[in-house]
């Protein structure tokens, strides 16, 4: 075999072993066994049972307080959502319409809005009413 080819194959093998999930190593023998997994699952199950019993006790404590109400009544008692959900969007649309239909912009033939405002105060500009 050619030395270049052998070197290339060795480098590819090392790269493959480096990028493999286990890094070319096998599973350790002293890893978590079935007994430790079973005890962890048992602890989770015990915690779940405790949580369920606490929730049931809380529900029983609230039960007598809500005996006179049916589910439909409690649903109706909840606040209704606001009728207009897109209020900020509508405000933006109104502002854009005002900009497009501004009287000052329609009447002004010579200057922009700022110059019109200055012109109305100083007597300069196109749409200035002369007071003599």
Swiss-Prot record:
Keyword Membrane attached: no
Places the protein is found: Secreted
Keyword ATP-binding: no
The record's account of how the chain is modified after translation: The precursor molecule is proteolytically cleaved, possibly by FURIN or CORIN, to produce the active peptide. May undergo further proteolytic cleavage by various proteases such as DPP4, MME and possibly FAP, to give rise to a variety of shorter peptides. May be cleaved at Ser-102 by the prolyl endopeptidase FAP (seprase) activity (in vitro). May be degraded by IDE. During IDE degradation, the resulting products initially increase the activation of NPR1 and can also stimulate NPR2 to produce cGMP before the fragments are completely degraded and inactivated by IDE (in vitro).
Pfam families for this protein: ANP
Signal peptide: 1-26
Molecular functions (GO terms): hormone activity; hormone receptor binding
Gene Ontology terms describing biological process: blood vessel diameter maintenance; cGMP biosynthetic process; cGMP-mediated signaling; negative regulation of systemic arterial blood pressure; neuropeptide signaling pathway; receptor guanylyl cyclase signaling pathway
Keywords: Disulfide bond, Hormone, Secreted, Signal, Vasoactive
Domain of life of the organism encoding this protein: Eukaryota
Positions of the record's site feature: Cleavage: 97-98, 102-104
Gene Ontology CC: cytoplasm; extracellular space
Disulfide partners: 110-126
Start and end residues of each stretch annotated as Disordered: 62-87
UniProt record similarity statement: Belongs to the natriuretic peptide family.
Protein purpose: Cardiac hormone that plays a key role in mediating cardio-renal homeostasis. May also function as a paracrine antifibrotic factor in the heart. Acts by specifically binding and stimulating NPR1 to produce cGMP, which in turn activates effector proteins that drive various biological responses. Involved in regulating the extracellular fluid volume and maintaining the fluid-electrolyte balance through natriuresis, diuresis, vasorelaxation, and inhibition of renin and aldosterone secretion. Binds the clearance receptor NPR3.
The protein's name: Natriuretic peptides B
């Amino acid at each position: 075999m050619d030395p270049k080819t052998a070197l290339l194959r060795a480098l590819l093998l090392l790269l493959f072993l480096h990028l493999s999930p286990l890094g070319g190593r096998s599973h350790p023998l002293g890893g978590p066994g079935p007994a430790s997994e079973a005890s962890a699952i048992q602890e989770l199950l015990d915690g779940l049972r405790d949580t369920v019993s606490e929730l049931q006790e809380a529900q029983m404590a609230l039960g007598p307080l809500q005996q006179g109400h049916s589910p439909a009544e409690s649903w109706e008692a909840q606040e209704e959502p606001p009728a207009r959900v897109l209020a900020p969007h509508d405000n933006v649309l109104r502002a854009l319409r005002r900009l497009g239909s501004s009287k000052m912009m329609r009447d002004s033939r010579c200057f922009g809005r700022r110059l019109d405002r200055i012109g109305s105060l100083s007597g300069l500009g196109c749409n200035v009413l002369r007071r003599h």
